[in-house]
A protein has these predicted regions:
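N-terminal alpha-helical interaction modules that lie
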Residues: 1-49, 83-132
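TPR repeat positional signature
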Residues: 20, 55, 60-62
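Residue-level signature for tetratricopeptide repeat
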Residues: 26-27, 61, 68
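Residues in the short coil linking paired helices within alpha-helical repeat scaffolds
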Residues: 32, 73-74
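Short, surface-exposed loop/turn segments at secondary-structure junctions
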Residues: 49-56, 74, 97
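Short secondary-structure subsegments characteristic of cysteine-rich extracellular domains
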Residues: 63, 70, 77-80, 84
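TPR/TPR-like alpha-solenoid repeats
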Residues: 68-70, 114
Length: 132
């Protein structure tokens, strides 16, 4: 039990509208990938007992770190993007309110052409959207 709810019922909705997730998305969508990942890192203790929320959080953290590395020219961006994609690939298309299919498609495109990622991040940065 977590906060009076059975954790199976929270599996795919625990992070829905969670303040850390909302701050993550705001910073991620603004291209502040490093800042974005910090918001979810702060909330990890809250989700460690909820597998889908944990997988989503870790995957999004890895994706944000990967894009931060790519945008900044640091090594390791491709590896982090790949790890993040692998983590969110097992989740449903909508998990905890996050629409994942568009993000997964963007990650696949970026991983297929790592040479152009930095330019794409400037011209057409990835976006994370929520369900209503």
């Amino acid at each position: 039990m977590i906060r009076g709810f059975h954790k199976d019922k929270l599996q795919y909705s625990f992070m829905l509208h969670h303040p850390a997730l909302l701050r993550f998305i705001k910073d991620f969508n603004s291209g502040r990938y490093f800042e974005a990942h910090e918001h979810l890192e702060e909330a990890l203790d809250e989700v460690e007992e909820i597998p889908a929320a944990w997988e989503l959080s870790i995957g999004l953290i890895q994706i944000a770190v990967g894009y931060h590395k790519c945008a900044s020219g640091y090594p390791g961006g491709e590896k982090m993007l790949g790890l993040g994609l692998a983590k969110v690939s097992s989740l449903p298309n909508v998990c905890n309110g996050v629409r994942l299919e568009e993000l997964r498609q963007r990650l696949r495109e970026d991983l297929a052409d790592m040479q152009g990622v930095k330019g794409r991040l400037q011209k057409d940065p990835p976006r994370i959207t929520l369900t209503k």
